[in-house]
């Protein structure tokens, strides 16, 4: 397990302090730390079984949407009343948390848990889109571009798996990575299925 479920992952680090904090966070979960180029785009999980793409989802980081009335803390409480949300993997979705990572994300927007975001403003509480950290998933199987599908199948075949999940970053999954960029973040030999 090195960084599974988004543990120890930090993205969009822009200052030396953020890099140092991200490195320290990663070291809490593994003695080895990998630093990679940041790829712009939405987080997708492409599920390949026996050489076929069987499902694709776009994952969105845990967030709240402002209403101009309630604080971020109150909005988190409201989101967490959704009966589909639980602790860990007990339910389809995981409850949102106001913790150090959420504080860092809010600080980037010059906000705190006591801030009242304007109506329709999205406030991300995580930089990664894992369901295990409060993220949500949207099915995109029917719109994935054939080049992106084939790339996922080739990746899983290249590492010798019958079942695998490809974490793929793209600004538009319906367009080819060959024309708009994007790329594989990682391949998972034991991918979670609950997002599909």
PLM regions: where:
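A short, surface-exposed helix-loop junction/capping segment
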Residues: 2-4, 113-137
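Oxyanion-binding "anion nests"
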Residues: 78-124
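ATP-dependent carboxylate activation and anion-phosphoryl transfer catalytic cores
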Residues: 38, 48, 52-55, 60-67, ...
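Glycine-centered small-residue hotspots that permit tight backbone geometry or close packing
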Residues: 3-6, 120, 164, 195
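Short, functional N-terminal and low-complexity linear motifs
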Residues: 12, 115-123, 174-178
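Active-site nucleotide/adenylate-binding loops and adjacent lid/helix of ATP-dependent enzymes
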Residues: 1-97, 145-150
């Amino acid at each position: 397990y090195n960084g599974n479920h988004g543990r120890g992952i930090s993205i969009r680090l822009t200052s030396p302090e953020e890099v140092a904090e991200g490195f320290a966070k990663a070291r809490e979960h593994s003695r080895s730390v990998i630093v990679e180029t940041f790829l712009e785009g939405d987080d997708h999980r492409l599920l390949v079984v026996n050489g076929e793409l069987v499902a694709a989802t776009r994952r969105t980081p845990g967030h709240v949407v402002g209403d101009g009335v309630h604080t971020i803390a109150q909005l988190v409480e409201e989101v967490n009343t959704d009966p589909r949300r639980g602790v860990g993997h007990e339910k389809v979705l995981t409850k949102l948390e106001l913790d150090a990572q959420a504080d860092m994300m809010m600080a980037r927007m010059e906000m705190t848990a006591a801030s009242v975001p304007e109506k329709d403003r999205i406030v991300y509480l995580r930089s990664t889109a894992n369901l295990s950290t409060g993220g949500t998933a949207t099915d995109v199987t029917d719109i994935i571009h054939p080049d992106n599908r084939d790339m996922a199948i080739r990746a899983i075949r290249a590492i010798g798996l019958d079942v695998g999940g490809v974490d793929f970053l793209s600004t538009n999954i319906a367009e080819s990575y060959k024309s708009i960029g994007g790329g594989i973040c990682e391949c998972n030999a034991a991918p979670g299925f609950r997002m599909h």
